[in-house]
Amino acid sequence: MEFESVSIKKPEELNFILGQAHFIKTVEDIHEALVTAVPGIKFGLAFCEASGACLIRSSGTDEALIQLARENAMNIGAGHSFILMLGEGYFPINVLNTVKNIPEVCGIFCAPANPTGVIIYDTGRGRGIMG
C-alpha cells in the first residue's frame, strides 16, 4: 500500500472539476446536463471505471479538452473518479450545482483553476482518491 501525488496537467487559464461517481452511465448524464445547462459550453470529460477492464470513458464538445481529461484520468487511475476540464471562459460556478445534482455523482473533491495535486492511495487491488 502506498500514497502517490498526481499533478493535474492543464493550461493555467482552465478550470476543472474532480469528482466521484458510481455508474458507467455517468459520462452520458454529465455530458447531457452540461450542454443543457450552458448551451455552447466547451468541455472534456473522462471517467475511470472500477471493475472489469477498468476502461476510461470520455466525452465532450472539444477534442483537445477530451484528450486532456483522458490524460489526467489515466494518471489518476482511481476507480469511479471523473475529471471535467472546462474550456477557457467557462467556470465551475456555472455548472457545479448541475453536476452535483446528477444522481450518479457521489461527491466533488475540488473545482479549481489553481495548480492541483491529487493524493492517491494504491492498495495493489485498486486506487482511490484521498484528497
Residue ranges, per PLM feature:
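Long, charge-patterned amphipathic alpha-helical coiled-coil/hairpin "stalk" segments used as oligomerization
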Residues: 55-131
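N-terminal, charge-rich interaction modules
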Residues: 1-58
